Regions:
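General structural concept
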Residues: 113-117, 139
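Glycine-rich anion/phosphate-binding loops
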Residues: 116-124, 161
């Protein structure tokens, strides 16, 4: 009977076709990587000692989002009866950041790469569509601007880790007006300048030296606005540069490469996460680097450039590292990164209210996926079959979803990570197929509620991550294009 009811509910809430009448001049999508419902809640508890305390948790539109990749599914009944339904990491079960970003940025599910469908065909991104509409566009991240999430909105590649190729594409071919992130080849993970920079003409992960030198010298660009003239990139690097860019006149195109993270040989780079001494600590036990801008400072710099366009803009802003905190089982580190993200959300809200309005700007807050399977102590009663087991195995009748323990403000909540990935070590955890939260406010926000796919027994109504693209494109075009483009 329960299964039948679930099926009927899913049918009743099938996504409806989008109609005209809702439009937005600007769309801001803010993504906290690897932060599901319990990561948000843990940060609430740590910051304020109570749930529901972030400003976005009072937004008028709040939904769940399914995140599965091509070939996957989300079953709201099984999700709450069997840990294995949302755990593990089979290719068609649990998404990666690149796949989730591609879904949100193109409306297509994929099985790998960025900006492609499940058959490896190149598909239009929302950045490209916004550019066709005459809008300014940007991507901002606390890791490399060529990494999975920003790349999924702004590039096309079969290999998500072909960062050298993605950088070339973003700087030389795309019409992006803003690209900001870390992985500066001249600086280590502590923001200290290197005697020998990390360049390579062969490694797919690292900057090509000639590209770096040319872009810093103002020699790379293309016709980004269709006026027949080349718009070259202006490069900013220091925290003071980012802070200054937040006010006053700006160049037409800005590449911000934070002075940090160049020694990450797999190209991710981070503004804060790999600073020396920071491990499984309470938040900010090792203070954030003073040399790296906060995500708030990066966001305000980007907005000050993008709002020069009278036709409006699209920007994706990512807080990248709740994900890695949760991968290592370091909840305190995930919380400090989420606090940085929360501060950025508040800064963006203040910017909208001072420089735009909710009548013309849509703000969407969400995540690409949950990481770690975070629950309270005692969750998932049962033990892995063996230390080398391929995934955390729990029988359905043993699945216990224990809430986090609120230890009060300033204290890390009582918790347990449940989704081990054993081949990476006993204390490494992976993405899950749990729903993630979405919060929205502003022009066209209510359109998201027309795309509800089903009702989760715990999280309530939910949409799919591909619907974020559909709604973004819809509010930009006021329904002037066919509603369904994706293959979901």
């Amino acid at each position: 009977m329960v299964v039948l009811v679930a099926v009927l509910v899913l049918c009743m809430f099938a996504a409806t076709a989008l109609a005209g009448g809702d439009s937005a001049k600007n769309v801001i999508i803010m993504i906290t990587d690897g932060c599901g419902y319990n990561c948000v809640l843990a940060t609430d508890y740590y910051q304020y000692g109570a749930a529901g305390t972030q400003v976005y948790e009072r937004f008028p539109v709040q939904l769940g989002v399914s995140t599965y990749p091509a070939g996957g599914h989300y079953n709201p009944y099984l999700a709450w009866t069997d840990f294995n339904e949302v755990g593990g990491w089979a290719a068609n079960r649990v998404t990666e950041s690149n796949m989730a970003a591609t879904a949100m940025g193109t409306g297509y599910k994929c099985a790998g790469g960025v900006g492609i469908d499940e058959h490896a065909n190149r598909v239009p991104t929302i950045v490209e569509i916004a550019e066709q509409l005459g809008k300014a566009t940007g991507v901002v991240s606390t890791q490399s601007f060529a990494e999975a999430t920003p790349a999924g909105f702004s590039a096309h590649a079969l290999d998500r880790k072909a960062l050298k190729s993605i950088i070339e594409q973003q700087l030389r071919e795309s019409k992006l007006d803003v690209a900001m992130g870390a992985h500066n080849p001249w600086y280590n993970n502590n923001g200290e300048k290197l005697e020998t920079p990390y360049f390579s003409d062969t490694s797919k992960y690292l900057w090509k030296e000639s590209t770096w030198n040319d872009v810093v010298a103002g020699k790379i660009g293309n016709d980004a606005d269709g006026d027949g003239e080349v718009e070259y990139w202006d490069v900013i690097e220091s925290r003071a540069d980012f802070q200054a860019m937040a006010t006053g006149p700006t160049p037409e195109r800005v590449l911000g490469v934070v002075q940090c993270g160049g020694e990450d040989k797999v190209g991710s780079g981070y503004t804060q996460f790999y600073r020396t001494g920071a491990a499984n600590d309470a938040p900010f036990t090792v203070p954030f680097l003073e040399t790296s801008p906060t995500l708030s400072e990066m966001s305000l710099a980007a907005l000050n450039v993008l709002d020069n366009d009278p036709d409006g803009f699209f920007v994706m802003i990512e807080g990248a590292n709740p994900d890695y905190g949760n991968h290592f089982g370091w909840l305190g580190r995930a919380i400090e990164e989420q606090i940085d993200f929360n501060d950025a959300v508040e800064a963006v809200i203040a910017w909208v209210e001072a420089n735009s309005s909710w009548d013309e700007t849509l703000l969407v807050i969400t995540s690409d996926h949950e990481t770690g399977g975070i629950w309270g102590p005692g969750a998932g009663v049962g033990t892995p079959a063996a230390p080398s087991a391929s995934r955390f195995i729990v029988k359905p009748d043993q699945s216990v979803f224990v809430p986090l323990v609120n230890n009060g403000a300033g204290q890390v909540p009582g918790h347990l990570y449940t989704n081990h990935r054993w081949e990476y070590g006993p204390d490494f955890y992976w993405h899950t197929n749990q729903l993630v939260p979405l919060y929205a406010k502003g022009a066209g926000a209510s359109v998201l509620t027309t795309q509800v796919r089903g009702v989760d027994p715990v999280r309530g109504p939910y949409i799919d991550n591909t619907d974020i693209f559909q709604v973004t494109r819809h509010v930009f075009t006021d329904g002037a294009v066919p509603a369904q483009v994706g293959n979901n």
